[in-house]
Amino acid sequence: MVGYRMRILFIPASAPSHYFPMVPLMWACRTAGHDVCVAAQPWGESVVVSSGMSMVTIAKSFDMTEELARHRRRGPVETAPGAPPALYQTLVDAQVRFAMEAADDVVSLARDWRPDLVVADPLVLAAPLAAAAADAPLVHHLWGPDLLRGSGYGYPGCGMAPDGWPEPLRELYARHGCEPRTENAVTAVDPWLESMQICEIPSRIPLRFVPYNGTNVLPPSVLAPAKKRRVLLTWGSMLVIRDGIEAFPVADVVKTLHEHDVEIVLAVKGADRGLVPDLPSGATVVENVPLNAIMPSCDAVVHHGGAGTIMTAAYYGVPQLGVAATRDVQTCCARLAATGAGIAVNREDATVDALASAVASLLTSDRIGPAATALRGEVLAQPSPAEVTDRLAVLAAGSSQ
């Protein structure tokens, strides 16, 4: 919307992998002349700033990574029949605690800066408090399949009636004078393809996924053409923290790939380098290289099933094999497999023989490649971040009248 300048407050969830999908829309907002500020925890002081955005630090004393790691150390927990899985309940409890820690910070920021629009990850339960404090619309920014709405277990503000919310969350909203609602957001921006979604999303705005996986100095080998077919192996940024490296069969995948005439590239965080097994000839490791830098040169990718990895590969038309350990990423992989552009194997089924069969199909199928190309076309057909920025400006302008 020409001539209307917005202040937009973005509030990502407590992980870089949830921040990255927001960055292209932030860039589009900035290049359209709008002001952008990010409210994030201390991890953002490097991740957010390196993406070119300014930020305000919130909830300094709460460590979501430690919360998830504590759950993993505790081990399996039995739940009653029909109750949400323990991991899901842990997620909800942790997000309520995060909201309680972040509430005063985001409300103070919203009152001082007066954003015209608040764009937040739907996980962030303090975001409606900020929107209410600024009298601004709240827009949810999704990152993958809408698991909060489509899981069947319910999540506050994403289809769950307020009488089902945790009592501490209702008390928090009452303290800040914010009415709890079944739907907290007026609309949802969705970079996950509608054809791969798991449920209907009210007032959905489709957004073209544009890969952003951070920045770094690249080794020249990453940009050099591959001498033979290149297969990328990656297990994302949160798997080790949340589930442990045993959730991804690194050694078995490397062994299986080595039986084919391919170049194997493992993309890992520097902190995970020590988890890489002894590698055969023809396999290399690159550390802290953004996936969007190396993915275009790859002929296939084997990964843990994260939504960001799936969509980055989809954007470049790369065939995929997802080996997924938990229900959330298993859902992502199942939706990918339904397009024909990839193969899904659940971790508990990932025997050496099953991996060998899946890898052989990935590298020899005459159907997966064309399906991956078609999926890329579907991604590129979605509205650009610039187009979505214009829609958000109309939304904000209408609410201010």
Language-model-detected regions and their locations in the chain:
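Phosphate/nucleotide-donor binding subsite
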Residues: 54-113
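Short gly/pro/ser/thr-enriched loop/turn and capping motifs at secondary-structure boundaries
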Residues: 45-46, 62-65, 145-151, 329-330
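Alpha-helix C-terminal capping/helix-to-coil transition sites in glycosyltransferase folds
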Residues: 112-114, 184, 296-297
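Nucleotide-activated sugar donor-binding and catalytic core shared by glycosyltransferases
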Residues: 5-13, 22-37, 50, 155, ...
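Conserved nucleotide-sugar donor-interacting segment of glycosyltransferase catalytic cores
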Residues: 90-171
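Donor-nucleotide binding loops and adjacent catalytic segments primarily
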Residues: 4, 207-300
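A nucleotide-sugar donor-handling region in carbohydrate enzymes
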Residues: 41, 163-239, 269-273
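Short loop/helix-cap segments at secondary-structure boundaries that form the rim of catalytic
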Residues: 44-52, 128-133, 182-183, 196-203, ...
